[in-house]
Amino acid sequence: MELKGSKTEKNLMTAFAGESQARNKYTYFASVAKKEGYEQIAAIFLKTADNEKEHAKMWFKALGELGNTAENLLHAAEDENYEWTDMYATFAKEAEEEGFTKLAAQFRGVAAIEKAHEERYRALLSNVEMQKVFEKGEMTMWECRNCGHLVMGTKAPEVCPVCAHPQSYFEVRGENY
C-alpha cells in the first residue's frame, strides 16, 4: 500500500506538527514556571516536552523524512529558502497592509535570519560533498568539542589525543570575542 497521498499520511503530518508545537509550548511554559519559582512544575513541563519530541520523531520517521546528512542539509536549505523568499515575505506584506508595522518588520527581520540559515546549510552541504568537514586546504585551528583540546593543522586528528573522542568531535575553532 502507498502512504503518499493517503489519509494516514495526512494524519502523520498533522500528528508531527501537533507534537512539535506541543514540545515548544511546553518548553516555553517550563521557562515561565521556573521564573515563578515552580521548579517541579518546570521539570514536568520539560519532561513532557521531551516525550512530545520523541512522539514527533516517531511520526517524522514514519513519513520517511529522515535522510542522510547531505540530504538533510539540502532539505533544510530548501526549507529555509522557502521561508525567507516566500513565506515571510508574504507575511510581512500582509501585516503591513493590515497596519501591523512592527510585526511586518519582525517578519522581515526573521526572513533575513532564515536567509543566513540557508547560506549556512548550503556551505555545510558543500563541505560534506567535498569532504572538507574535517580537512581544509590551509592550516586551521581545530578544537575538540568534548574536552577543548586545540590542534593546528590542515586536518582534524582521527582521535583526540587528550580525551580519545573520534574526529567527529572536532570543529574549526571560531572566536567571537
Describe each model-derived feature in a short phrase.
Residues M1-Y177:
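Non-heme di-metal
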